[in-house]
């Protein structure tokens, strides 16, 4: 089977997670500067079989799109143009940063490590992907 890639898109940094080949478990991959994201994905897709890409959908509590959506939409258009064979799906990303911080706290990370924004983005992408994978099982 192929992998699924999840993206927690940010203006400066973007967290990336990937599934295992059985598409059961999400693993954090890395965080990349957003301006390098398309090239990073291109390199990854060239090395690994990828079935689809999941994008964290930023919504406000009232279910409206957040301010960051205006940055995500042009990126998704570029992504679909460069990789037309890869389906792109959105997953609600509300509370992923809160869950990422809670995960780091429960894992016993020191305060300095919990302040690492790149790690928060990577864990958020992992949560987005795991949410997607679990939704497909049931």
Curated annotation (Swiss-Prot):
GO MF: nuclease activity
CDD domains the record matches: YqgF (cd16964)
EC number of this enzyme: 3.1.-.-
A cellular-component GO term for this protein: cytoplasm
Keywords: Cytoplasm, Hydrolase, Nuclease, Ribosome biogenesis
Cellular compartment(s): Cytoplasm
InterPro entries membership: RNaseH-like_sf (IPR012337), YqgF (IPR005227), YqgF/RNaseH-like_dom (IPR006641), YqgF/RNaseH-like_dom_sf (IPR037027)
Gene Ontology biological process terms in this record: rRNA 5'-end processing
Cited NCBIfam families: RNAse_H_YqgF
Family: Belongs to the YqgF nuclease family.
PANTHER family, per database record: POLYNUCLEOTIDYL TRANSFERASE, RIBONUCLEASE H-LIKE SUPERFAMILY PROTEIN
Function of the protein: Could be a nuclease involved in processing of the 5'-end of pre-16S rRNA.
Protein name per Swiss-Prot or TrEMBL: Putative pre-16S rRNA nuclease
Source organism of the structure: Bacteroides thetaiotaomicron (strain ATCC 29148 / DSM 2079 / JCM 5827 / CCUG 10774 / NCTC 10582 / VPI-5482 / E50)
């Amino acid at each position: 089977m192929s992998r699924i890639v999840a993206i927690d898109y940010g203006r400066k940094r973007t967290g990336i997670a990937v599934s295992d080949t059985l598409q059961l478990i999400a693993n954090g991959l890395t965080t990349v500067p957003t301006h390098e994201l398309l090239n990073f994905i291109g390199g990854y897709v060239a090395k690994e079989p990828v079935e689809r890409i999941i994008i964290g959908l930023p919504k406000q509590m009232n279910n409206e799109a957040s301010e960051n959506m205006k940055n995500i939409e042009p990126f998704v258009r570029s992504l679909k143009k460069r990789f037309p064979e890869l389906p792109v799906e959105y997953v609600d990303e509300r509370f992923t940063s809160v869950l990422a911080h809670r995960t780091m706290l429960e894992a016993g990370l020191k305060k300095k490590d919990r302040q690492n924004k790149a790690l928060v983005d990577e864990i958020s992408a992992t949560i987005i992907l795991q949410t997607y994978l679990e939704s497909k099982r049931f």
